[in-house]
């Protein structure tokens, strides 16, 4: 198989879909890998490392997409990449289709086999390719939030850890999943007072045990959420419904009652966000203010630390890349129910129910199409 690795073109996206180590393994397995020049440069993986591993360095994205049987990326294609789509192309990347109906339409129109990292499941039913970036984003969310709490960046001027004689800042984490637990770890490490809000009482019990009672846990309902965000200096949004648009847990009315200069970091923004006042931003223009509250809603937060993020992501994605290359997409999808869950579009048909529900489109299970 010919595997193409284009350079990411989303604003300040600096990760890369395959590392030199991955290239070496693919080439040794008899596959050909085309890497766009400088695709890995911002992840501290220069062209000469890819060449040494056996990749062919290609000068243009057009040729990478045109010649590859399967394109491996990190982020969902942006509008200027839509022209590369063609029938039968296998696209393996984060897709986050629920809030992007125009991308869905293009993938369907061109009959692309779109396999989304974020909906692949393992035998335990977890989301193994979403986990590493959720870990990075969860930990980063507190770093970013702490920075934006500084007065110079529009925040309240609060030091999260406080100092002797001055209480620490309050951090409210909405969602007790991978993002939430990693955000809580960093916030606690900085000395903040941390509250985690979740709908699942069993998860709250687990978190209480994990943190040995040192975090506050709160059952999610509108009354509790209103109170928690009103008291918070920093709110982290980390709610996920796999494949679907994130539910709006924090409403405009709740935001209007928050402290002036408080900060919101909505990590769920690539699925539409779980804060009603959140809208997607970029690393070039990351933050804005609503009702005196600073909002940081960058859709590709882990791109700020691309070396760590690329290594963490490809550790998880590469076994699937190798399986798809070795078996071909159809056979690989047929053989692995978890990989089937990752197929969002196939031969012009939408195959992911949460995306279909979010966009009001018809869908079919991919198993019925194979």
Can you say where each PLM-predicted feature lies in the sequence?
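An N-terminal-biased, well-structured beta-alpha scaffold segment characteristic
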Residues: 2-106, 110
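Rossmann-like adenosine-cofactor binding region
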Residues: 209-291
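Adenosine-phosphate binding glycine-rich loop
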Residues: 118-159, 269, 274-370
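Short glycine-/small-residue-rich Rossmann-like dinucleotide-binding loops
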Residues: 69, 75-76, 95-96, 221, ...
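Glycine/serine-rich phosphate-binding loop and adjoining beta1-alpha1 elements at the start
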Residues: 2, 8, 77-170, 298-300
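Glycine-rich phosphate/diphosphate-binding loop of Rossmann-like nucleotide-binding domains
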Residues: 6-45, 152-240
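Generic hydrophobic/aromatic pocket-lining and core-packing "Φ" positions
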Residues: 23, 47, 104, 142, ...
């Amino acid at each position: 198989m010919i595997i193409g690795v284009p350079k990411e073109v989303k604003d300040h996206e600096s990760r890369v879909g395959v590392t030199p180590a991955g290239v070496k393994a693919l080439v040794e397995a008899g596959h050909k890998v085309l890497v766009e020049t400088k695709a890995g440069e911002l992840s501290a993986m220069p062209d000469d490392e890819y060449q040494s591993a056996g990749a062919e360095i290609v000068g243009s994205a057009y040729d990478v997409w045109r010649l590859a049987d399967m394109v491996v990326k990190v982020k969902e294609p942006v509008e200027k990449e839509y022209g590369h789509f063609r029938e039968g192309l296998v696209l393996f990347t984060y897709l986050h289709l629920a809030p992007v109906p125009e991308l869905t339409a293009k993938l369907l129109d061109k009959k692309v086999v779109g396999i989304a990292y974020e909906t692949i499941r393992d035998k335990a039913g977890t989301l193994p390719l979403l986990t590493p970036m959720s870990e990075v984003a969860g930990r980063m969310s507190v770093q970013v939030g702490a920075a934006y709490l500084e007065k110079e960046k529009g925040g309240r001027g609060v030091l999260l850890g406080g100092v002797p004689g001055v209480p620490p800042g309050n951090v409210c984490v909405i969602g007790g999943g991978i993002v939430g637990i990693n955000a809580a770890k960093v916030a606690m490490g900085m000395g903040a007072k941390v509250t985690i809000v979740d709908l699942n009482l069993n998860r709250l019990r687990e978190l209480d045990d994990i943190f040995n009672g040192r975090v506050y846990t709160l059952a999610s309902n509108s009354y509790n959420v209103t109170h928690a965000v009103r008291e918070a200096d920093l709110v982290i949004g980390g709610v996920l419904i796999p494949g679907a648009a994130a539910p709006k847990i924090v409403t405009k009315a709740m935001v209007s009652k928050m402290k002036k200069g408080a900060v919101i970091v909505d990590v769920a923004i690539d699925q539409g966000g779980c804060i009603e006042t959140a809208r997607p931003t970029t690393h070039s223009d990351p933050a804005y203010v609503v009702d005196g509250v600073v909002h940081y809603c960058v859709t590709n937060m882990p791109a700020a630390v691309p070396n760590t993020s690329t290594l963490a992501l490809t550790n998880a994605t590469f076994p699937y890349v190798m399986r798809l290359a070795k078996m071909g997409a159809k056979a690989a999808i047929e053989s692995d129910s978890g990989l089937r869950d990752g197929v969002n579009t196939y031969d012009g048909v939408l195959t992911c129910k949460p995306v279909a529900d979010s966009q009001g489109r018809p869908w079919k299970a991919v198993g019925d199409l194979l």
